């Protein structure tokens, strides 16, 4: 330590007596936010289909207004921290951590869920440990290590040089709140945001997050989303208006005296989809034979999901409430952003009729704040992976199996319920990431294709293993329900298609889609990429004719 202090004393003395050295030191301080802006955008762009270098060059040459805004925000924050601390190294450390971690989270989230890091995702910080399972299967690209290393090296140099702001404390105390105030005005003030147009930006909430983050860079895109945090009431919105709108949907007549309330089960099957719809792939056997067998005797077909590859919470919310998320900001998480009071849902409707209402998820119930939101939707209980009464099975990949969910549903159905029970189940077994998810010895569905790479074949093999396991449990639940004495109705549906490689890898390689840019898809391709299977079955004659005509609903 003594030797280190001597070295630092010599460095300080050299800088004080040599103006060029002092100039270089302060130039490094001045350029630090520029480095963070460049490296942060590069980290975020690592998940882009055109490559980080191309996207960064485009940002600097064509969308430089967006780059300048993001860089300005970092300068304002860094300047405020330097004023507070006086010493540059701790201010640089805090600034570096924030503006390196945030784009890194954006990259990781995009790789895992195919959704960018949005302002309301800050509410998920308490569930950060939930992502550790995904991270273990994620391959960190080499450029990310270099970018992290560059920031660490920059911080190390500043720590050695130890620049100190040569300004009296009174001016520093005044400067910090002024800079933070400017930061607030630049990000949150409506008048200032309206002037974003001077930089070639729109102050309106983005509708296409991929385009937003690709064209504007991470930090500017993140800030543009801040306008979506609060939504005003639509015109003519009132309780009276809603009562009038819903009046036409009231039932014409009540059920007969001999009507027996059925138990109702709704199961969101993670990434449940029919892989045989891929072009130029021949399967040796059907991955979902039980679904097809049940569908042939019951009602079902294809439904159009509101999301692809991730964002389970949105189709889940839509099915539970009957409300669309398409009018909400892109990338929304309804439970976190909008569910703060009791709202209508089918769970509440059944609860009002005397049913017990139970939510079951074979993962952490705190994720997406389901544990807080479900009671507001009318659920009596929300059970997570640690609350299950049935045996937990981890014999298929890193997540609890669908077998665990089906056994818990059976357990709940066997419990006494005065009138009936409504169960919402959410599976987890077939969640991505799919690369190397299972040992090849566990693959149970084979196929041939001349267009898939080795990695893409690995992805598809692992997905087929998972979806066939899900299908097996659908068949098991079907047999249980059909042999049950009490009337029971089941809805089983897939929430979205799986993510099978970067840039829609498997889908593009097989020719299922003709472009890796979603905006260029044909109407037929859009249906293909957003349509998931569903089936409705019951163990009694409902007495109602099914209305769907087989087209996606």
What name fits each language-model region?
Residues 95-98, 125, 216, 406, ...:
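Short amphipathic alpha-helical surface patches that serve as generic macromolecular interface elements
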Residues 95, 119-122, 216-221, 461-471:
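Short, well-ordered coil↔helix boundary/capping segments
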Residues 122-125, 215-219, 239, 288, ...:
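Alpha-helix initiation and N-capping motif
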Residues 2-210:
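Transmembrane and membrane-interface helices of multi-pass
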Residues 247-262, 266-269, 274-553:
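Solvent-exposed soluble domains appended to multi-pass membrane proteins
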Residues 187-266:
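Membrane-interface segments at or immediately adjacent to transmembrane helices
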Residues 113, 120-122, 207-218, 306-310, ...:
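Membrane-interface micro-motifs in multi-pass membrane enzymes
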């Amino acid at each position: 330590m003594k030797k280190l202090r001597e070295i630092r004393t010599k460095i300080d003395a050299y800088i004080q007596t040599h103006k060029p050295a002092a100039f270089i030191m302060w130039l490094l301080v001045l350029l630090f936010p520029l480095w963070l802006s460049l490296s942060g955008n590069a980290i975020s762009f690592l998940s882009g289909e055109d490559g980080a270098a191309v996207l960064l060059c485009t940002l600097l040459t064509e969308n430089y207004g967006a780059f300048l805004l993001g860089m300005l925000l970092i300068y304002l924050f860094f300047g405020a921290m330097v004023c507070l601390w006086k010493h540059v190294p701790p201010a640089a450390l805090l600034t570096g951590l924030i503006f390196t971690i945030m784009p890194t989270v954006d990259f990781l989230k995009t790789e895992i869920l195919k959704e960018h890091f949005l302002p309301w995702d800050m509410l998920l910080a308490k569930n950060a440990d939930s992502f550790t399972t995904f991270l273990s299967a994620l391959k960190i690209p080499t450029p990310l290590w270099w970018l992290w290393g560059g920031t660490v090296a920059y911080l190390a140099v500043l720590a050695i040089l130890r620049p100190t702001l040569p300004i009296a404390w009174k001016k520093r105390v005044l400067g910090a709140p002024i800079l933070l105030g400017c930061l607030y005005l630049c990000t949150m003030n409506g008048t200032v945001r309206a002037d974003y147009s001077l930089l070639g930006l729109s102050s309106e909430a983005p509708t296409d997050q991929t385009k937003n983050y690709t064209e504007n860079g991470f930090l500017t895109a993140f800030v543009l989303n801040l306008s979506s945090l609060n939504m005003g009431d639509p015109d003519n919105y009132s309780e009276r208006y809603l009562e009038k709108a819903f009046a036409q949907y009231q039932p014409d007549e009540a059920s007969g005296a001999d009507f027996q309330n059925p138990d109702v089960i709704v199961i969101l099957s993670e990434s449940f989809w029919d892989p045989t719809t891929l072009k130029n792939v021949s399967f040796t056997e059907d991955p979902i034979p039980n679904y097809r067998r049940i569908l042939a005797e019951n009602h079902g077909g294809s439904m159009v999901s509101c999301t692809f590859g991730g964002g389970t919470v949105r189709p889940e919310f839509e099915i539970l409430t009957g409300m669309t998320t398409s009018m909400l900001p892109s990338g929304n998480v309804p439970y976190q952003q909008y569910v703060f009071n009791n709202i209508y849902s089918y769970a509440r409707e059944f609860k009002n009729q005397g049913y017990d209402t139970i939510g079951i998820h074979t993962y952490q119930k705190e994720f997406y704040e389901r544990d807080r939101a479900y009671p507001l939707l009318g659920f009596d209980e929300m059970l997570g992976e640690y609350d299950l009464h049935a045996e937990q099975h981890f014999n298929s990949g890193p997540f609890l199996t669908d077998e665990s969910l089906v056994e818990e549903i059976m357990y709940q159905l066997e419990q006494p319920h005065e009138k009936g029970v409504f169960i919402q189940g959410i599976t987890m077994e077939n969640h991505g990431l799919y690369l190397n998810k299972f040992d090849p010895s566990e693959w149970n569905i084979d196929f041939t294709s001349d267009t898939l790479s080795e990695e893409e074949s690995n992805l598809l093999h692992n997905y087929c293993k998972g979806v066939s396991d899900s299908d097996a449990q659908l068949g098991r639940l079907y047999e249980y329900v059909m042999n049950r004495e009490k009337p029971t109705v089941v809805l089983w549906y897939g929430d979205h298609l799986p993510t099978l490689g970067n840039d829609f890898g498997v889908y593009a390689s097989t020719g299922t889609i003709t472009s890796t840019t979603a905006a260029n898809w044909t109407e037929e391709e859009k249906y293909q990429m957003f349509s998931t299977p569903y089936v409705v079955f019951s163990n009694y004659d409902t007495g109602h004719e099914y209305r769907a005509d087989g087209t996606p609903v």
